Amino acid sequence: MESPVRFEHVDIATILKTLPHRYPFLLIDRVLNIRADHSGIGVKNVTFNEPAFQGHFPERPVYPGVLMIEGMAQTAGVIGIMSVEGTEKPRAVYFLTIDKCKFRKPVMPGDIVEYHMRSIGRRKTMWWFHGDAKVNGTIVAEADVGAMLTD
């Protein structure tokens, strides 16, 4: 049985209030279906105008895998921060670990990447998430990421 949805749609304005990241390093456009079990889906619309495509690779642009991992971490950060109850919301998320990372297929301009993230552990301010990056339902990357939520 699926956990109930707590936040159905987190738009870019709310993400900007939640994360400290800004252009060119804010790598998610929205977060969908944040559930009570600390899972959710980050969405990134990959366009040819991404700064990374100037050098990766001009003749055959491929969205860098490390930016997908950062997109996973940013999605996890939004889920973690919005899952904290009460008025003392954390103001920063520090990316701590990457484990079991695999890149399976290239992501190109025009693709919509969905970062399917779910919490796999939590201890005090430390959170761990498993993530699958998907394009049209196909896994293009996966990783476990750890982060610390702090003031």
Curated annotation (Swiss-Prot):
It is found in: Cytoplasm. One of its GO terms (biological process) is lipid A biosynthetic process. The keyword Lyase applies. GO terms for molecular function: (3R)-hydroxyacyl-[acyl-carrier-protein] dehydratase activity. It holds the Pfam family FabA. It comes from the Bacteria. Keywords: Cytoplasm, Lipid A biosynthesis, Lipid biosynthesis, Lipid metabolism, Lyase. GO terms for cellular component: cytoplasm; membrane. It catalyses: a (3R)-hydroxyacyl-[ACP] = a (2E)-enoyl-[ACP] + H2O. It is an enzyme of class 4 (lyase). Its EC number is 4.2.1.59. The active site is at 56. PANTHER family: 3-HYDROXYACYL-[ACYL-CARRIER-PROTEIN] DEHYDRATASE. Belongs to the thioester dehydratase family. FabZ subfamily. NCBIfam families: fabZ, PRK00006.1. Involved in unsaturated fatty acids biosynthesis. Catalyzes the dehydration of short chain beta-hydroxyacyl-ACPs and long chain saturated and unsaturated beta-hydroxyacyl-ACPs. This is 3-hydroxyacyl-[acyl-carrier-protein] dehydratase FabZ.
